[in-house]
Amino acid sequence: HDDKIGKGRFSTAIRKGQKNRRLAFDVDSKETIIMQFKDILLNNKSIYGSELVRVNIAQLLYDLQKYFDGFSVYTSAQFNTRKMREPVTIKNLDDFLNYDAGNFTNVFNRYTSEDMLWRSLFEDRMKELIPNLKMIDAATAYDMLIFRMLYSSGEQYDLSDVSEGTLKGLILNMLINMPMNRERALLAIDEPETNLHPAWQKVVGNWIQTAGTFKQCFISTHSPDFLDVFTEEFIHGNVAVFVFRDKEKIKKITYADIAEDLGDWELGDLYR
């Protein structure tokens, strides 16, 4: 990149002694080069005219883009539950949950339309959190789409009536059990425990450890209760714990490092 925001530069010389030519282009400072490289090529004749850029560098960046396409990163603080509670215009274009989860109902409707088995799985997962839940559904009313929940008592609620914890459970259920044509490389969620009862945190932790929709899951948490559920897999080496402290290097903790201190305790006990 250049020293000015919105400008990019790179050299074409890749071997010692080779004549160098610096190519410059405009970039979107809020997006990575990988995601906008195709547009950069098409909008800059001088860059597209370089075989090195058009073939070698482009292929490398496309390979990187394909890899990072498998990354799903979400932050609990950005979930907009107020927006999620509102009826939505029916759309079938949303493949993934937005960063703010505002398109939850449309994504749910699309997934259930494409795969009835996924709907059954999603419903069963929610019943682990809410045992008296009988059925969930997305229904139309006045050309708007509404997500509804039916309880064993016969009471029905839409998302405007349920608690913040219930909304959070719905979001995490979708993220962790999202149907994919191919396995995701990484699912990252910042503080998934927010607004969740400790008992629900354990359920969500089990979802993460048993889901087959991603190769790795990265969780940042301040909750000892949430950590507890990962104790057994941590002992077996299937869960890694990293400690972040200001002005210190990130430290990975293994079971061997703390076996004596942990004893018969659970992971969360180290932070209580």
What are these regions (language model features)?
Residues H1-D124, E128, K134:
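Electropositive, glycine-dotted interaction segments
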Residues R125, M135-R272:
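Switch/communication elements of ASCE P-loop NTPase nucleotide-binding domains
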